[in-house]
Amino acid sequence: MYEGKKTKNMFLTRALEKILADKEVKKAHHSQLRKACEVALEEIKAETEKQSPPHGEAKAGSSTLPPVKSKTNFIEADKYFLPFELACQSKCPRIVSTSLDCLQKLIAYGHLTGNAPDSTTPGKKLIDRIIETICGCFQGPQTDEGVQLQIIKALLTAVTSQHIEIHEGTVLQAVRTCYNIYLASKNLINQTTAKATLTQMLNVIFARMENQALQEAKQMEKERHRQHHHLLQSPVSHHEPESPQLRYLPPQTVDHISQEHEGDLDLHTNDVDKSLQDDTEPENGSDISSAENEQTEADQATAAETLSKNEVLYDGENHDCEEKPQDIVQNIVEEMVNIVVGDMGEGTTINASADGNIGTIEDGSDSENIQANGIPGTPISVAYTPSLPDDRLSVSSNDTQESGNSSGPSPGAKFSHILQKDAFLVFRSLCKLSMKPLSDGPPDPKSHELRSKILSLQLLLSILQNAGPIFRTNEMFINAIKQYLCVALSKNGVSSVPEVFELSLSIFLTLLSNFKTHLKMQIEVFFKEIFLYILETSTSSFDHKWMVIQTLTRICADAQSVVDIYVNYDCDLNAANIFERLVNDLSKIAQGRGSQELGMSNVQELSLRKKGLECLVSILKCMVEWSKDQYVNPNSQTTLGQEKPSEQEMSEIKHPETINRYGSLNSLESTSSSGIGSYSTQMSGTDNPEQFEVLKQQKEIIEQGIDLFNKKPKRGIQYLQEQGMLGTTPEDIAQFLHQEERLDSTQVGEFLGDNDKFNKEVMYAYVDQHDFSGKDFVSALRMFLEGFRLPGEAQKIDRLMEKFAARYLECNQGQTLFASADTAYVLAYSIIMLTTDLHSPQVKNKMTKEQYIKMNRGINDSKDLPEEYLSAIYNEIAGKKISMKETKELTIPTKSSKQNVASEKQRRLLYNLEMEQMAKTAKALMEAVSHVQAPFTSATHLEHVRPMFKLAWTPFLAAFSVGLQDCDDTEVASLCLEGIRCAIRIACIFSIQLERDAYVQALARFTLLTVSSGITEMKQKNIDTIKTLITVAHTDGNYLGNSWHEILKCISQLELAQLIGTGVKPRYISGTVRGREGSLTGTKDQAPDEFVGLGLVGGNVDWKQIASIQESIGETSSQSVVVAVDRIFTGSTRLDGNAIVDFVRWLCAVSMDELLSTTHPRMFSLQKIVEISYYNMGRIRLQWSRIWEVIGDHFNKVGCNPNEDVAIFAVDSLRQLSMKFLEKGELANFRFQKDFLRPFEHIMKRNRSPTIRDMVVRCIAQMVNSQAANIRSGWKNIFSVFHLAASDQDESIVELAFQTTGHIVTLVFEKHFPATIDSFQDAVKCLSEFACNAAFPDTSMEAIRLIRHCAKYVSDRPQAFKEYTSDDMNVAPEDRVWVRGWFPILFELSCIINRCKLDVRTRGLTVMFEIMKTYGHTYEKHWWQDLFRIVFRIFDNMKLPEQQTEKAEWMTTTCNHALYAICDVFTQYLEVLSDVLLDDIFAQLYWCVQQDNEQLARSGTNCLENVVILNGEKFTLEIWDKTCNCTLDIFKTTIPHALLTWRPNSGETAPPPPSPVSEKPLDTISQKSVDIHDSIQPRSVDNRPQAPLVSASAVNEEVSKIKSTAKFPEQKLFAALLIKCVVQLELIQTIDNIVFFPATSKKEDAENLAAAQRDAVDFDVRVDTQDQGMYRFLTSQQLFKLLDCLLESHRFAKAFNSNNEQRTALWKAGFKGKSKPNLLKQETSSLACGLRILFRMYMDESRVSAWEEVQQRLLNVCSEALSYFLTLTSESHREAWTNLLLLFLTKVLKISDNRFKAHASFYYPLLCEIMQFDLIPELRAVLRRFFLRIGVVFQISQPPEQELGINKQ
C-alpha cells in the first residue's frame, strides 16, 4: 500500500518540481501557478512523512499496479489537480506537456479518478473538468506538436481507463479534440496518431456498451438459474422473452441528450428527431457469432499496430518532458497493450467459456481472428451467444406508416445504460460530420472539409464493421442509422471524389451485410438511385462504374444477400425489381454494351466486362450454393445395390426448412462458404416460397398493367381489372391513380379530363379523395396538381378546376373569403394561367402584378377579392411555379442524348450535373423512408432459386453467349463457361427444362463440334467448352433429361474429331464404305470421308489445311478429355433410375444418326451402348427393364439395318450381352429374359437377309446349348424366333431351327420341365409352324410326331402345370393343365388341319382325335366344350380354301373324316359329353346344313343320324327333346320357300313388285331362313335391305344383283335352293333312319312290292330289324313333332309340284337343267316316312293313350294324300306315288277289322276313283285285296276260303 502511495507521490512531486523548475514559471503572470505548485508540494511532503511504513515491512506489490482502493488513498490525488489545471492553462508548451504527462500517468495508474463533484460547476464531476482542461490545451493548428501528442495520449488514457468514468458530453469532447487535432495538425505523425487514437476510443466506447449488456445478460441468466433450479436439466431457451439489460437500469430517453455535448464539432443540429420511435422496446437480440462478438479486440490490436509503424527505439523509463514525439507514440502503444492485457480482470480469461470451444464460428471466418488481447472489461466467451428474441416481430411488423405524424417524444426508444447514450452521441456526431458539404469547385485533397468527410466515413465504417449485438439490434442505433447514416450515405454515395465514393460503398456493404433486416427501404434507394443508376447511365465515369462493380462483386458473392434481394424487392409489390435490374445491367456490361460512349480504353472495357461476368457468375454460384441440398451428386452414390437415404435419415442430417446459409462457394464442387451475409439469417418474417411466387406474379401483372396504362389508360385499367388486381368502382380507380407513382402523369391527366361518363366519375372520386381542409388556396391547388399533368384541352382543364373548386369549398366551409365555388373556380383558372405566363419560356411579355389583379376584378360574386390576397398569390407563383412533384424514378438519359456527348470534358460536366440531381433525389428519398418500418424477410428456403432463375436466365445466357462468341480472352471464356455450368445446375435441380436445354444447346454450339463450318476455327475456348460440357455430363447427369441429346451428339462428333486429330482412319464398319454403285470411293484428290463428314472441306483437298486442322484438334485427343468422356459412360451406373433411361434414349438416337449417315456410318455410339449395357446390367431389375426397353428397341432397328455389317455387329453384340444376362438366371414369375431377348425376335421378323436370319438362329441355338439351365421366361423368345424360322424357305435355317427345337422338346423339357412350362404353348405353336411349312414335308411329319410327344409330357406331369403360377392367375389350378397343356396341343393340331396339304392335315387330324381318345378320360366337362370349339373350327367356312376344287376335296376328305371322328369321340365319352356337348354338336350340325355346300349339308345330317343312332339308347327324355327340336329347326330352315315365290325379272332394272298374295305368312322361325319375298322388301329405314345371316347370303346377293342389273342373278340363288332341297330330302331320310334304323324302310318297301307281286300280303311276316331303330325311345309327342315336320315338307313339295306355271318359269330361268324342276322325291318320301311312323304308333300297344290322335291324323293324312293323287295329271308323277300307295294300302290292310272299318269307310270313295287310273299290276293286286276286305268287314260278302286266316280283332 505504501509503495503505491509512494509512486503516486513520486509522479506528483517530480511533475510539480519540473513545472516549478521551468524558467517560464518564474515570470510574473504565472504566480498563481507557482503558488499552487508550492502548496501542493508541501502537502505531499507532510503526507509522505506521516504515512511512511515501519522499517521491517517488505515491499508490497509492484509499484505500477493501482493500489487497493480505499477512501484514504484516493481523495487526496484529486485535490492536487489545481496546479495541473493552471499549468495546462499556461501558454508554455513545456509546462503544458509536463502537466499533461503527469495527468496521463495518474489516470493510467488509477491515482486520479475525479469522482468527486466539481466545486466550480454544480452537477458535474471533477473528471469532467479534468478532461475539459486537457482538451483546452489544444488551441488550434498553432498548438505545439509535442503538446498535441500529449493531449492525444492523455485523452486516450482517460477514455480507455478502468479507473475513471466519463460520459456524454465529456466523451464527445474527448473524441472531438482528437478529431480536431487530426484535421488541424500539420505533423503527419500526429495525424496518424490522432486517427489511430480515435479508432481506439471508438472501439472502446462501443465495446464497453456491448460488454455491459453481455455481463448483465449473464447476471440475469444466473438469477434465472437460481430461481428455476429444477429447470437445470432442460436446455436454456434460445428465445428470451425480452432482453435482460432493459430491466433495471435508469432509463434515459433520447430527449435528455443536451445540446452542449456537441460543442465544437460544428454539430449544432437539433436534438434527435422526436419521431425516433417504434412500438417495442429496443432489445438486445443478435445472432452474431462469437468471432464477430470479439472482433473489437482484433481491431484494437490492429490500431496499435498502425501506431507502432512509426516507432523508433524506446529509451528506457524516460519520463522527462523532452520525450520525442516517437517516444510518446511508443508509450501510447505500450501502455494500451499493458492496459488491455492487464485489465482482463477476473473471469475474463480467454478460456472462460465452459467448454472452451472457441472454434464454433458460424460465418466461416477463421478462429485466428480471436486474439487474446481483450478490451478492458470485455470477457471473451463463446458460451453465451444472445439469440434473437421476439424482436423479430417488430422488425417485420407491417407498420410501414411513417411515424412522423405522431408528435412528441416516443416513450419507447430509451437507452438502458449511459454507455449506450455515449455510443449514440458519438455515432450521431460522426454521421453529421460526414454530411457536411464540400466547398464548390474541384475538391482539394488537403482541405479540412474533405479530410473531415473521409475521416468521419472511415470511423463510421470501423464502427459498423465491429458492431456488436446491441448496436445491431437496439432501436436507437437502428434509427440513428436510418436517420443519419443513410442520409449521409445518399449524399456521399454520389461523390465525385473517388475516396469518398469508395468509403460510402464500403459502408453500404457493411450495412447490407449486418443491418439489412432493418434497412429494407434504404437499401432499395441505394441500389436504385445510386448503384444501378451509375451502371445504367452512359455518362458515369469508368472509375465510378468500376468501384460500383467491385462492390457488387462482394454483394453477388453472398448467397444470403442475393436471395434476400430477390425475395424482398422483386417479390414486393411496392419495391423496385432490383434483382432483375441488377442482372440485366450486369449482363449489358458483361456483353460490353454501351462502353463505346464512355470513351473507355480497350483494357478498361475488358476489365469491366470481366467484372460484370464475375458478378453474374457469382450470383449463379450463390444460387447453386443456396439450393445445394436439392442436388444429388451422381458420383457420390451408385445405383448398384444402394438406395438414397430415407426421408427420415435426411431430416436427421439437416432440416432443410431453416438451414442458415452463409456466403457462397468457390466452385461447384466446393461446400465451403465465405462472405458477408453472416449476420442474422433468421431475422425475418415468414419465408414462404409459394407466397412469394404468387406475389411476384401479381407484381408482374401490375407492371404490365402500368405499361399498358402509360400507352392507353383504359386498356391498362381494363387489363388490371380482368386480372383481379383493381376494383371496378370509380373510387377504386381513383385511389389507384393516387397511389401508383409509376403511372405517366400526362396519361393520368388525360384520363381524368376525358368527357366519358365513367372517366368523370373517376375524376370526381379522385378529387374527393383529397383533403384540402385548413390549406390556403394556392397550397391546395399545388397539392391537387402534384399528381398529374394538366391536359392541354380547355374543356378538360375546365372540368377539373370546377370540381377542384367545389371540393375546396366543401373542405373549408368556415372560410369567408370566397362568396361561392365560382369564385374559387375562376381564381384557380387564373392561377394556372399566371403560372404558365410567368414560367413559360415561350411567353416573352410577362404579366405584371397590376395586370393580374385587374384580370381578377369582380370574380367574387361581382365583388373583388382583397388586393393584398391576390398580390400574395402573384408573389408566391412568381417565386415558385406550380408543378408536379418530381417522380421518384430518375429518368435515364435517352439514346439521343448519349450521342451528343462530344468530349470527355463535356461528359464530365454532364455527369456532375446528373450526380447532383441524383444526390438530391437519393437524399430526399432517404429522408422520406427514414421513419418507415418495412418488414424484411430473410430467405431460408431453397425453393426461391427457381423463380429467380426463371426470371433472369435470359440475360445470363445472353452475357455468356456473347462472351464466348466474340471474345478470345481465356479469363472471359472460363467465366462464361463457369456461369453456364452453374445455370445448367440450377435448371437441372429444379427441372426447368426449357432453360436447361437452352444452356446445354448453347454450350454444345460453342464446342463447334456440331456446326457445319466445323472444326477449322477451333480455339482454346472451344476446347474448354468441350471439357465443360463433359463435366456437366459427369456432375449433372441425373437431371439432364433431353439435354443428353446435345451432349452425346457432341461426344459422338468429338470422337470423329479425335480420329482426324490423330490422323487415324475411322473404324468404319466395312473398312471402306461402298458407294451406291458398289465401287470403292476415295480417289487421289478427294478428301477422306471423315473430313467431308464433319463439313470441313469440299470435294478437293488442301492437305495443308488438313494438317492445320489436325493440329487445332489435337488437344481434343488429350488424355484428360478421352478419360473424361470414358468416365461419362463408366459413370452411367451412378445415374438414377430416370436419368439412365434418358441417357440411354439419347445415346440410341445419336447412334441412329451415326448409322444413318449416307457417307460413312459409324458405330461409336453403338459400341458405347453395348458398353453401358454391360456396366448397368447389375441394376435392380425394375430399372434395367426400363433401360432395356430403349436399348432393345435400338437393337431392333440396328439389327434390321440394310448394311449387313452393321446388323451383324448388332446381332453379335446382342448375343454377347444375352449370354451375360442369362448367366444371372431368373426367379420364377419374372419376365426380364423375355424382354431382353425380344430384339432377336424383331430382327428375325423384319430382316429378310438370309445371313442375318441364319446368324440369329445360330445365336439362339448357342444360347440353348450353353445356357438351357438358366433360361426361364426367355424360352418364349427362343420359340418365337424358331417359329419365325420355321416358315423360312432356306433349308439350312429351317433345319438348324428344327434341330434345336427338337432338342428342346426331347431333352430340355425332360430335364427342366417346370422352367419351360410358361413357354410350353410357344413350343407347341412353334412345332405347328414347322408342320405347316409345305416346303419340307418330312419336317412337317416329324413336327406332328413331336406334338404327340408333348401330349405325353402333359399326361405324365399334370402336377407341374397345376403348381405353375403366372400372369393368368385367374385360371383355377385344376384348369391349368388344360389351359397350358392340352388346349395348346389340340389347338395347334386344329391349325395344322386347317392350314396344311392333305397328307399332313390328315395326319394332324388323326393325331388330334387319337389324343382325344387316348387321354380324353382325364378331361373335365368344360374342357370338352373348349375342345369342341376348336374341333368345329375345321368346318368354319371362313377357314375353308377358296377354290372350288380344293373346297370339294376338303369337304369330302377332312370334313367327313372329322365329322365321323367327332361322333366316335362323342360316343366314347357319352356320359361326360351328353349334357355338355350335345347342344354344341346340334348347333354345329344345324349350322352345317345351312351352308351353301351340299356335301357339308349331307355330312351334317349324316352326322346327326350317326350320333343319334349310336347313342340314342342312352339319351334322356330331355336330350330327345333337344334332338327333335334340332331336327325341327333344320327342317324349317331348309324349306326352299323361294321356289314358290321367285319371279322372273319383268324389267331389266326395276325389282319385281311385291306379290299381291302371300300363300302363307312368312313365319320364319329361325332368323336364318330368309324368304326372297321378304328380302326384296327393304325393311330398314334407310332403304337398304337388312343383311340376313349366312344362309341368306345368296339371297342377299340376289337382291343386290337385281339392283345392279346383273345378267344372271339367279344362278347363285338357284344353287342355294338346290342345296335346301337336297337337305330336306336328306333330313327325311335321316328321320326315317333314326326312327326305324337305316335301310329298314327300304327293305319294307321292297317286301311290300314283292308281296304285292306275289299278290299276297303276308300278315304274319314281321320285319326283324324293327326294334333297332330309336322309335321305342321317343315319346308320342316327339314323334308327333317329327310328323309335323314331315308333313310340312310334304305339303310344300306338293304345292310346288302342283304349280306348273312356277316350275316352267324356273325351268326357263335355268333352274335344274333340262327338265322342269320338281320335288317328287321329297313329296313322296316325307309322306312315306310319316305314314310309317303313324302306322307304327297305331300298332303299338304301349301307346294306347295316343291312339285316338294317331287315328285322327292317319285318316286326315291318308284322305288328303288320296285326294291329291287323284288330281295328278302326269303319268310320271303318279308313277312316283306307286310305292307310297303300296305302303298305305298294305299298312291299312294289316290293321284290325274295327279300325279297318273306320279307315275304309273314309277312303272308300277315293279308292274307287283311283281305279280309273292305269295302275301297275302290284297296286291293282293290293287294291283288290282292300276291296275284298271291305266286303268282309262290312259283311257285304263272305270271305274267300284262303283268307279266313285274317285276324278279326
UniProtKB/Swiss-Prot annotation:
Q: Which Gene3D superfamilies match?
A: 1.10.220.20, Arf Nucleotide-binding Site Opener,domain 2 (1.10.1000.11), Leucine-rich Repeat Variant (1.25.10.10)
Domain SEC7 span(s) in chain numbering: 709-840
Q: Which residues carry this modification: Phosphoserine?
A: 52, 286, 289-290, 397, 410, 1079, 1566, 1569
Q: Compositionally biased, Polar residues: which spans?
A: 394-409
Under the heading PROSITE patterns, the entry gives: SEC7
Upon changing residue 221 to K, the result is: No effect on self-association
Subunit structure comment from the entry:
Homodimer. Interacts with ARFGEF2/BIG2; both proteins are probably part of the same or very similar macromolecular complexes. Interacts with FKBP2. Interacts with MYO9B. Interacts with PRKAR1A and PRKAR2A. Interacts with PPP1CC. Interacts with NCL, FBL, NUP62 and U3 small nucleolar RNA. Interacts with DPY30. Interacts with PDE3A. Interacts with KANK1. Interacts with TBC1D22A and TBC1D22B. Interacts (via N-terminus) with ARL1.
Quote the function comment for this protein. Answer: Promotes guanine-nucleotide exchange on ARF1 and ARF3. Promotes the activation of ARF1/ARF3 through replacement of GDP with GTP. Involved in vesicular trafficking. Required for the maintenance of Golgi structure; the function may be independent of its GEF activity. Required for the maturation of integrin beta-1 in the Golgi. Involved in the establishment and persistence of cell polarity during directed cell movement in wound healing. Proposed to act as A kinase-anchoring protein (AKAP) and may mediate crosstalk between Arf and PKA pathways.
Q: What is this protein called?
A: Brefeldin A-inhibited guanine nucleotide-exchange protein 1
This chain's source organism reads Homo sapiens
Gene coding for it: ARFGEF1
